Amino acid sequence: MSIRTGKVSSLLQKELSSIFEKELPRSGPLLTIVEVKVTADLGIARVYVSLIGSEKERGLLMEHLQNETKYIRKLLSSRIRHQFRRIPELEFYEDEQYDKARRIEELLKEALNRPGEEQTES
């Protein structure tokens, strides 16, 4: 990642976080912008979001984000249009690291709480 794309990614993440917090508040799953990756030509911004909620709620919110992409891009444009010639297209992806970490935690707890199993040394 070049310095320029890194700065653009950071700015987009900050502005999108602010948009979701202040201009598009929703009840339902908690939404956090984990990372924004911008293509080298700055034409596409891939926005990775972490969602905490039920599977159904998360699915509905991802669908909502896909449907509202143009509106979100318009809000973003109104904030940063003086810094860019062209506002990147937005693509939203669910970041599943939280779910993976939670599943690993559950498996570890389950393994540690199994009664009657003795560990042997090799």
From Swiss-Prot:
Cellular component terms, GO, for this chain's entry?
cytosol
Q: Which UniProt keywords apply?
A: Cytoplasm, Ribosome biogenesis
Please give the InterPro entries that the UniProt record associates with this protein.
KH_dom-like_a/b (IPR015946), RbfA (IPR000238), RbfA_dom_sf (IPR023799)
Q: Name the principal localization, coarsely classed.
A: cytoplasm
Cellular location(s): Cytoplasm
- GO molecular function terms listed in the Swiss-Prot or TrEMBL record: ribosomal small subunit binding
Cytoplasm is among the record's keywords: yes
Lineage top rank: taxon: Bacteria
Keyword Cytoplasm part of the UniProt annotation: yes
GO BP annotations of the record are: maturation of SSU-rRNA
Q: Which family does it belong to?
A: Belongs to the RbfA family.
Which NCBIfam families would you find in this protein's record?
rbfA
Q: What does this protein do?
A: One of several proteins that assist in the late maturation steps of the functional core of the 30S ribosomal subunit. Associates with free 30S ribosomal subunits (but not with 30S subunits that are part of 70S ribosomes or polysomes). Required for efficient processing of 16S rRNA. May interact with the 5'-terminal helix region of 16S rRNA.
Q: Fill in the subunit field for this protein.
A: Monomer. Binds 30S ribosomal subunits, but not 50S ribosomal subunits or 70S ribosomes.
Name of the protein: Ribosome-binding factor A
Q: Which organism is it from?
A: Prosthecochloris aestuarii (strain DSM 271 / SK 413)
